[in-house]
UniProtKB/Swiss-Prot annotation:
Entry's Gene Ontology cellular component terms: cytoplasm
Gene3D superfamilies cross-referenced by the UniProt entry: Metalloproteases ('zincins'), catalytic domain
Entry keyword annotation includes Metal-binding: yes
Protein's name in the database: Endoribonuclease YbeY
Biological process annotations from GO: rRNA processing
NCBIfam families in the cross-refs: rRNA maturation RNase YbeY
Residues that bind Zn(2+): 99, 103, 109
EC number: 3.1.-.-
Enzyme class: hydrolase
Location(s), subcellular: Cytoplasm
Cofactor: Zn(2+)
Keyword match Oxidoreductase: no
Gene: ybeY
Amino acid sequence: MIDFDNRTSLNLHIEVIEQIASSLTNKEIELIVTDKDEMREINSAHRNIDKATDVLSFPYIEMPLSPLGSIVICSLHVEEKSKEFGHTLNDEFALLFIHGLLHLLGYDHEVDSGEMREEEARIIKEFNLPQSLIVRSEG
């Protein structure tokens, strides 16, 4: 289940997000979409990086019946990247969600041997989405 908090004026749909989440976990996920200023504040407070970023994940402590964690997505990145890559806002939203969800599930593309990239590619293909965040970042 997705607990969706859209703090922006973007018209985003979570049907595909719900399907992606339920294909990978049965735990609740908090999903927040916010503006670049709040994202910068969150990034600064939790990572000591004083700039906005596209997506952040915050896993919760593993306990029975506890939610998996929170994913925060920056609306500006959704808008800019969807225009840059020529796909819909909802496609970009889904790509960022997948990236954040995989981090909640323990994947880390900065240290793994390509497992996160492979899993991202599998999910993207399954849900017929455009090119992945990791592939774009490596290009």
